[in-house]
Amino acid sequence: MARHSVMYFILLSALIDKSQACFCDHYPWSQWSSCSKTCNSGTQTRQRRIVTDKYYFENFCGQLCTKQESRECNWQTCPINCRLGDYGPWSDCDPCVQKRFKVRSILRPSQFGGQPCTEPLMTFQPCIPSKLCKIEEIDCKNKFRCDSGRCIASKLECNGENDCGDNSDERNCGRKKTVCSRSHNPIPGVQLMGMGFHFLAGEPRGEVLDNSFTGGVCRTVKSSRASNPYRVPANLENVNFEVQTKEDDLEADFYDDLIPLEDNKDQEALGSGLATSSFRVPIFYSSKRSQSSSHSSAFKQAIQASQKKASSFIRIHKVIKVLNFTMKTKDLQLSDVFLKALNHLPLEYNSALYSRIFDDFGTHYFTSGSLGGVYDLLYQFSKEELKNSGLTQEEAKNCIRIETKKRFLFVKKTKVEHRCTTNKLSEKYEGSFMQGSEKSISLVQGGRSAYAAALAWEKGSPVPEERVFSDWLESVKENPSVIDFALAPITDLVRNIPCAVTRRNNLRRAFREYAAKFDPCQCARCPNSGRPVLSGTECLCVCQSGTYGENCERRSPDYKSNAVDGNWGCWSSWSSCDATYRRSRTRECNNPAPQQGGKRCEGERRQEEHCTFSIMQNDGQPCISDDEDMKETDLPELESDSGCPQPVPPENGFIRNEKKQYSVGEEVEILCFTGFKAVGYQYFRCLPDRSWRQGDVECQRTECLKPIVPEGLTLSPFQTLYKIGDSIELTCPRGLVVNGPSRYTCSGDSWTPPISDSLSCEKDVLTGLRGHCQPGQKQLGSECVCMSPEEDCGHYSEEICVLDTTSSDYFTSSACKLLAEKCLNNQQLHFVHIGSCEEGPQLKWGLERIKLSSSSTKNESCGYDTCYNWEKCSATTSKCVCLLPSQCTKGGDQLFCVQIGSSANGKTMNICEVGAVKCAKREMEILHSGRC
């Protein structure tokens, strides 16, 4: 049949010669229809304007011509406009600034080219307060008080230096004493060391430290580049100009996409005191040791460049240091402008006013670092051209490094590799691999901005001249930046000002809310598993390797994956403070959830933190300064000639009707805290001699408090309190296991076994080793062999109590070792119970059970254990469960004469009944084997 079809086709082709073939363009196309969608990929169609004439039939146009075509249109993602919420209610009138405020939040950032939000998020109006302003001035004691409220040492008054910052210490002076015998210039760029740093935006902000303050000490440091020494400010612990920069320490990195350049900063990275949720901040590291140095505008430029075509990136960077510095750890002098901003903060918490501190002065300050510059360029290459060049990733980045050294850094001994000039990409540009890039993006830090910008270039433009690098390098000495720095939270500086503790706590609370504005959980899903990044009020998409487009909606021909990577949704609100003074919040991996083999979300799903709550009447925020013990206490005790003072409750108890004085004959009731119960007579009576008549009463624990588990572990079931006998289990993310016991039981006053602080998650080596084999075995190729107890059981596995029947000794072993020994047919080791061996009823029954097992006709493997005649294996727990004596089959060969309890008569039982009775912990003595 197939042969006849081929012959028919050949004959048909022969009949249709060139003169008879249909010229399809004889029938023109109609206009393209309008797109079915305005965005998010629609379709449009067009049809041929066919006329069924003689030409149409004679030339087989119906068979040869395409009558309709369709194409994709408006593939760009639909824009999302930024949307603001309504203003909330007016706040209470702040008694210190005499204003009230109302705020609103961004409900949705703009994305995919939507309209941005430009309206303010806060408004205020004057008001008449109903509370008193409780800000108190700091007592300077024997120090000099500046007009700004700052306290400085008395010896600094009238020394010819502006130590107050407002010059109030130099007024009305007679004779002035000098500190230094001659004048000294400040260290170049010393003000930069005192700038705040906005960790979330990745840029310096306002001055927080006054590095012009010298503290009345003439301390100087010399530089080899200057003849006169520089004056060292009081805030600096150490400064060193003798910094060596190697000629050839140029580093190169290759990136398939920009996602590795986007750094995920967690709580620890933010520093103690400013803990918040995990969120992504675009960071470009200035060197290996650098904490961070970011350029959000440069990052945005790189994202936009990558969206135009499928790209790879090569980054070239070199650090040039002028000096190193270290700040003091305490007694830092704040800048006058920062001090004034702190002093103007209200005592009553106001999110908008406190958040302005972070906008103006950043979130952190520099504790150490270097002044200098970073030569840092990001070269964008077409992924297709780079692939066609024939170079590997390692060869490509090496070629850029070599050409940079030769062209800009003037390194004398630079060997040019043959592959760098003769590959297909370099040959298009006269042997220059660098000019084969689409563009380079300047991430340069330090130096004059004009020189830094001139180091970048774009295809089609002239390559930067050789002197551009030397001009920039020379300008770094006069215009350095802070690089290779370490940070500390700005809240650490809020000390020795009025109400420092109150304001410090308010700032920490404000930061938690402020940081949420940078969390990309608010962004919509990016196409093709693009990574969303929140930049201001706009969401951007960082494209995966092999995707491009304004929103990563386009794919390279070789990108075939349909996997959707998971991304975190936003954190829930914090729960209320519970009885353990802890609160928690959660988030879900549903923005989107991983699909079709996509990556799971990285990071923790649940967070916990310490919390407090107040039982005092709210008369306004108290002013708490450093070194003050402000506690919730009652009024001072009043003198009384009759009645009883407040009695002392038992440990873990309190008095229901608590007060300072009680009348004669009055009773008080003793209650216990949550998790405890009162045992004894709970009432005390006040006697005429001002003593209390009270019986024995104590608060005994009935429940266990929720334990604090190390970070990374998940506790289940999650409850505030657990009853005695309840168990909890600790688990790790998929592929990891707990490096210690995972199951714990509430035993009254503590958890058994004790929960160690050193618990963590580690790679699940044993499961990987076991493969598809039975417990105690490992997979070698396609075969299953017994594990070696010595070589394969080095990682943690559950502790169990084991009896060696040869020596009659019992000891604690790992489950891995027991299973491996059983696989090797070691008959002398027997499972006793889960957990370490400890004297008690559990161990006693375990040993007796093993003795009885010698008479058992049933030996059923069950988890670590072997079940005998009087037991069955639980399918859910893989543990042996005792039968009831009535469930045992009567008769059999294994019979015993036993005496139960105080009965004088013997009774005949089989092995199942004997084991069941003993398992039920009933008193029994085996008189002899056989019938009575």
UniProtKB/Swiss-Prot annotation:
PROSITE patterns in the cross-refs: EGF_1, KAZAL_2, LDLRA_1, LDLRA_2, MACPF_1, MACPF_2, SUSHI, TSP1
Superkingdom, taxonomy of origin: Eukaryota
Chain positions recorded as Ca(2+) binding sites: 156, 159, 161, 163, 169-170
Signal peptide: 1-21
Keyword match Acetylation: no
PANTHER family (UniProt xref): COMPLEMENT COMPONENT C6 (PTHR45742:SF4)
This protein's name: Complement component C6
Organism in which the protein naturally occurs: Bos taurus
